[in-house]
């Protein structure tokens, strides 16, 4: 692998990292879900909801857990947000939400895409300062093709990715 897209934070020796864009997290819900009547979602609105998550070891799962301190984890039995079901990919989580198995938190670009592909889905932003992540390019310091990295960065930054803002 020469160059990767990765969510920050990411720190490895001899790896260069260049932020590309920031992206808010939003809630993906079925159109008929009670939370669909709300314009914005408070974190307390998720209390006692079945929030579908990525499986253990996935960086996005860790980002959601950090953003939602009430998420029910093994080390936090008092948490009020339940996570009973896990998916292996963002696409799987979208299908699970469309099937009525629960709700999920997604990067906004993924949630917009899911909503555009499936009219049974809705997205809602979080109230106040929304949880977010930064996506970056990363490559080895010894990688000799710097112009290739520059061309990739330029191509990504010149494209329109709904739900993101350039870093």
Briefly describe each language-model feature range.
Residues 1-29, 93, 98-101, 121-124:
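Short beta-strand-centered segments that line the small-molecule binding cleft or hinge
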Residues 1-7, 86-88, 105-107, 111:
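Short beta-strand and adjacent tight-turn residues that come in two discontinuous sequence segments
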Residues 8-9, 31, 57-58, 108-110, ...:
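Short secondary-structure boundary segments
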Residues 15-31, 39-47, 126-135:
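Short Pro/Gly-enriched coil loops immediately N-terminal to beta-strands
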Residues 26-28, 34, 52, 103, ...:
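Residues embedded in well-ordered beta-strands
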Residues 50-75, 145-154, 159-164:
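Secondary-structure junction motif
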Residues 101, 121-166:
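A late-sequence structural motif
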């Amino acid at each position: 692998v020469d160059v990767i897209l990765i969510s920050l934070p990411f720190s490895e020796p001899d790896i260069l990292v260049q932020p590309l864009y920031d992206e808010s997290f939003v809630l993906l819900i079925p159109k008929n879900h009670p939370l669909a009547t709300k314009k914005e979602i408070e974190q307390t609105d998720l209390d006692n909801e079945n929030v579908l998550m990525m499986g253990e070891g996935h960086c996005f799962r860790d980002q959601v857990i950090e953003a939602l301190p009430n998420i029910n984890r093994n080390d936090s039995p008092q948490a009020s947000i339940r996570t009973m079901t896990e998916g292996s990919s963002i696409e799987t989580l979208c299908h699970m939400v469309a099937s009525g198995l629960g709700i999920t938190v997604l990067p906004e670009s993924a949630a917009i895409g899911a909503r555009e592909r499936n009219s049974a889905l809705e997205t809602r932003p979080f109230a106040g300062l929304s949880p977010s992540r930064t996506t970056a390019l990363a490559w080895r310091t010894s990688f000799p093709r710097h112009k290739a990295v520059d061309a990739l960065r330029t191509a990504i930054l010149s494209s329109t990715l709904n739900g993101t803002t350039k870093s």
